[in-house]
Amino acid sequence: MLKKTVTYVDYNGVERTEDFYFNLSKAEVTEMELSVEGGFSKMLEEIVKSNDNARIIELFKEMVLKAYGEKSADGRRFIKSKELSEAFSQTEAYSEIFMELALDEKAAAAFVNGIMPANLGK
């Protein structure tokens, strides 16, 4: 699980600093891998090699929104829904994160590594 602390200015002009959480479960990663012929990781590698910026941006948006969620109070669940992802995508915090990933290769790689399950190979 990746926690990103983001400072942004909301639509009322108020500066906010908030924590946002991103995670992909083993099941989600497996589903992504099996949903693309040849595997998701191979497709990702090919897109990056091709320098298809439009596709890279589209893929990052998809990954950020798929990984976004909220931890339950007891820490047992990581709650995700289309509604939560859509609401998050309408914030300046999302815009800050998206721009960081779009403009900084190291930040993008750290994000992808951070959202992957720690024990994926096990």
Report each predicted region and the residues it spans.
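Charge-rich, solvent-exposed alpha-helical interaction surfaces
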Residues: 43, 59, 63, 97, ...
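Acidic, aromatic-enriched beta-alpha/helix-loop junctions
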Residues: 28-62
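Generic structural signal for hydrophobic core residues of well-folded globular domains
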Residues: 47, 67-68, 101
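Short, charged/polar N-terminal "headpieces" of proteins
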Residues: 1-42, 108-122
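C-terminal charged interaction modules
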Residues: 72-122
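A contiguous, well-structured "functional interface" segment within a domain
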Residues: 1-4, 64, 77-81
